[in-house]
């Protein structure tokens, strides 16, 4: 499937997903007596919000088609190349992995990987896809990522800019979750020790909670911590885009997700609550 087909399919599924959200909202309304009296969000407001997003996405997609040579998906492999492996049809859609990045992953060099990512980091150009492709070259991605987090106190100064290395930690663990990396017993035990250490630093700092929950999610440590406490941390990080991902991965059950939604609603954060409704 080409990139344009993937986008079109996702847009076509919006109505179906909105129906599921409507059912979740109706279930919530059935327990309205448990909600804060100040809760006044209506389905029409939610529907209007997502309809606006849908319209904007569809409009931009049509504009993309009108300005780019996608009609024939020219970036696909030509039929004349049919003699190549069938898997080559998708190769042009894969991100290019820089040789240095690939070499670091092949050598399982976590510290070198952190330094490299900090050096090339650009807020305007997300690295998720390239790192996801590169990390698959590592014989042991989970151990490499853990090495990077455990051993990094690196902050570049030659450029004169400060950088929060925790952003790289989160990126690496996001990718680890995405590729469903194998976690050995030794790596898991090391990660458990690090997670307890990081948990002690959380306090009321949402980004520390975000890193902690990624440790729990990426290294499959959900059973090592109290679920109620994990749910409280999810509330702390609800504003971050990764919140629902880690919530699902760490095993917060449906009952506690319901309580989380109620807490968000009572706190005047209905849009954040919607994220957890389906």
Swiss-Prot record:
Q: Does the keyword Coiled coil apply?
A: yes
Q: Which domain of life is it from?
A: Eukaryota
**A Pfam family matched in the record:** Frigida
Q: Mind telling me which InterPro entries this protein's record contains?
A: Frigida
Print the keywords alphabetically: Coiled coil, Developmental protein, Differentiation, Flowering
Q: Name one GO biological process term.
A: flower development
UniProt feature coiled coil, ranges: 1-36
Signal peptide bounds: none
Q: Of which family is this protein a member?
A: Belongs to the Frigida family.
Q: What other remark does the UniProt record contain for this protein?
A: In cv. Columbia and cv. Landsberg erecta, either FRL1 or FRL2, but not both, is functional and required for FRI-mediated up-regulation of FLC.
Its annotated function is as follows: Truncated inactive FRIGIDA-like 1 protein.
Q: What is this protein called?
A: Truncated FRIGIDA-like protein 1
Gene expressing this chain: FRL1
């Amino acid at each position: 499937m080409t990139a344009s087909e993937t986008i079109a399919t996702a847009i076509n599924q919006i109505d179906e997903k909105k129906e599921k959200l409507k059912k979740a909202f109706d279930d919530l309304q059935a327990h309205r007596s448990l909600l804060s009296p100040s809760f006044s969000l209506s389905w029409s407001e939610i529907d209007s919000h997502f309809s606006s997003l849908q319209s904007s996405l569809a409009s931009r997609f049509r504009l993309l088609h009108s300005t780019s040579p996608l009609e024939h998906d020219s970036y696909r492999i030509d039929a004349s190349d049919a003699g190549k492996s069938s898997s080559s049809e998708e190769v042009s859609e894969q991100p290019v992995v820089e040789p240095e990045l690939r070499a670091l992953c092949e050598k399982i060099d976590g510290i070198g990987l952190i330094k490299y990512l900090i050096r090339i980091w650009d807020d305007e150009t997300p690295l998720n896809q390239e790192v996801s492709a590169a990390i698959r070259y590592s014989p042991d991605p989970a151990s490499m990522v853990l090495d990077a987090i455990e051993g990094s106190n690196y902050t570049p100064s030659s450029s004169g800019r400060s950088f929060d290395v925790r952003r790289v930690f989160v990126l690496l663990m996001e990718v680890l979750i995405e590729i469903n990396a194998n976690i050995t017993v030794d790596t898991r035990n090391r990660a458990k020790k690090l997670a307890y250490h990081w948990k002690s630093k959380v306090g009321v700092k949402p980004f520390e909670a975000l890193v902690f929950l990624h440790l729990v999610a990426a290294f499959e440590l959900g059973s090592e911590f109290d679920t109620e406490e994990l749910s409280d941390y999810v509330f702390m990080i609800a504003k971050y885009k990764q919140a629902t991902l880690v919530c699902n991965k760490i095993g917060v059950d449906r009952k506690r997700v319901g309580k989380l939604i109620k807490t968000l609603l009572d706190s005047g954060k209905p849009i954040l609550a919607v994220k957890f409704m389906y």
